């Protein structure tokens, strides 16, 4: 995980705990983390000296790049699926279209039946049917073909599910 550059900064562990607590409490924007920041019970529950503001979360998440995301989430997924009580998993693989409005990184014109000619993303997703958990997710540009790069996606997914017997559906 990215470290803090300042000795006044918050630890990565605190930022993750506080951010996840905010999400569990309904936050869906960085600014919403200010609500849990003011909650004394949450601060005492976690044993934090002080609570981080929304700008701290933005700076923390901006330190991640594709390589560090891959490293962190592969380890997180491996830990999760290793502790899962299922040894035989059914993997559902799908792709979909997300129409984008405005200018979003990676959005391109491609096949879009609902909004032809609009910018979109065309992600690949894999789900474990038994526990309704996302096993892998790759965000691709809108001009990607449905099966484009599926072999590498499945290799990455199987790496995250190491030690489990997987059936595809």
Give the label of every model feature segment:
Residues 56-125:
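Active-site-proximal, Lys/Arg-enriched surface segment
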